[in-house]
Amino acid sequence: MMVTSASKRILLIDDEPDVQRVVQTCLEKLAQWTVITATSAEEGLLKAIAEQPDVILLDIMMPKMDGYMFLDALWVKPEMQFIPVVFLTAQAGLLKPHHYETLGVKGIIAKPFDPLTLHRAIASALNWDLGT
């Protein structure tokens, strides 16, 4: 069963335009979610505060401010502490579940990714039952 909700907003923070296009297309077609994009962690932080997304998809390796620095900056703001974050990264094989869970991250998706895996990880972060 596919979970759909036009009201869900996903903030994608990734410095690669091709990744942004693929993720946006997948999520808008598969789940009819709205995808807000940011090409840097700094821009993502501003958009997270302004948009209050339902989930943040976050790349780890970015110039200037990486994904870990973004989390530090995001979670010092009390109103942002409850937004689920899912890593979308080429470094997935280097991270163990206990590592990202201690950071407060709800999941990790390896690049390249399968669209259904992407959808399931976000749905899981939203605590939705996919009925699989």
Where are these regions (language model features)?
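Two-component/phosphorelay signaling modules centered on CheY-like receiver
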Residues: 17-36
